[in-house]
Amino acid sequence: MIKYIGVFAFLVGGFCHDFETVISNQDPIVDGMRLVEGDMLFDDGPLFTERNAVKYDQQLWPNGEIVYEISPGLRQYEQIIREAMRTYEDNTCIKFRRRTNEADYVNIHVGDRCYSRVGKSFRGGPQPLSLGRGCTDFGTILHELGHSVGFDHEHSRADRDEFLIIHKENIKNGSEHNFDKLWENNTRTIGPFDYDSIMLYGAYAFSKDTRKFKTMEPVEPGLPMKSVIQKGKLSYYDIVKVNKLYKCPPVNPYPGGIRPYVNV
């Protein structure tokens, strides 16, 4: 049975800004890795463009087990972080285990923005997942954990132009690269395009004016494009894709065949 925790139950401590309005619009180097599309870290160099789901099995967590450590600065948010982890655990074969002395782990800490390494680092050792101001709602934590599991943004898929209209004229200056598409021959694309995915930003992401100008909208008119914080849950196909990537046993997260709209 799929288990969801609604986003609004976890808007605590004043960190309730939509992270799509606070993520970086540049590609700096953070901990020796390149920050791409605002919140994803990749090992700097030619491999950092090879994205969607991670391409190489070495970037998957062995046996689907992700070792983590939560910094003391996030103690008041530990419950919501664990609830987000349990959402993956309850619906996929991914497991999160608190670190004892393991060398390879996700270091969940308070940074100056929201970001995560995508998949397991080739280099090994600790890899950052930052939950700064505006990053501690349930949907955003699910999103950043999705990067740690191994997924890129849905709006960067090589086939995204079949499903999304990108309004380049509405993108704020310096943020255009956040809408670059993946290279089709350098990515592992899994499943159909999913408008409900927690890995898809909302219609106003990186907008010059988030009250007026959409930067993305569905090709099919009338379909909603909620922000990550508004979604606040994994979609059916988020779950299917994780299970496929990690070769999990079959799972039916929607008993009775109830599924959200997905453009196949």
UniProtKB/Swiss-Prot annotation:
GO terms for cellular component: extracellular region. Its EC number is 3.4.24.-. GO terms for molecular function: metalloendopeptidase activity; toxin activity; zinc ion binding. Zn(2+) binds at H143, H147, H153. Keywords: Disulfide bond, Glycoprotein, Hydrolase, Metal-binding, Metalloprotease, Protease, Secreted, Signal, Toxin, Zinc. It is found in: Secreted. InterPro entries: Astacin-like_dom, MetalloPept_cat_dom_sf, Peptidase_M12A, Peptidase_Metallo. The active site is at E144. Its cofactor is Zn(2+). PROSITE patterns: ASTACIN, ZINC_PROTEASE. Residues 1-16 form the signal peptide. Glycans are attached at N173, N185. Inhibited by 1,10-phenanthroline. GO terms for biological process: proteolysis. Residues 17-51 form a propeptide. Pfam families: Astacin. Residues 52-249 form the Peptidase M12A domain. Expressed by the venom gland. The keyword Metal-binding applies. Disulfide bonds join C93-C248, C114-C135. Binds 1 zinc ion per subunit. This is Astacin-like metalloprotease toxin 1. It comes from Loxosceles intermedia (Brown spider).
